[in-house]
Amino acid sequence: MNTNTMPLEAETRVLIDRSLENLGWKLSGKEQNVYYEQPRSEAEKKKLGGKRPDYVLYSKDSDKPLIVIEAKKKGVRLDAALEQGIQYAKAIEAPLVFATDGVFCKAFHTVANRPPILNGEEVDEFIREALALRYLTSYEVNTVSPKVQYDRK
């Protein structure tokens, strides 16, 4: 399909798919850990009561949802999309939520009830599975030494 004729939210989904693939997420095949418009299990579908998150991402080593992503067309305010994603994530107990229009991205940690922090800054882009797993124990992750962070400021 020509991207010039796609609905705007579909364009956002193409960008999301590319980003997730580049980060090592599996969109299809035997190792698939990205699910479109539904979670993986019937129990999670039931918890959502017919609602359909745009994406649900899982760790390759777990059946528990790790991330919910809400996709919106360019120019739509992400606050409402993030809130929608938070509701879905809390229903299926996913700790991380992302909302994006393909240009901007907002993230939220449902357990800490605040944005996740990476190296002292709010997360504003999709992350690899290995990094997402580190957010299971804390809303704040450091991948560089505190000295480097301090020197950067």
Question: At which residue positions do the language-model features occur?
Answer:
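ATP-dependent helicase/translocase motor core
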Residues: 1-66, 72-153
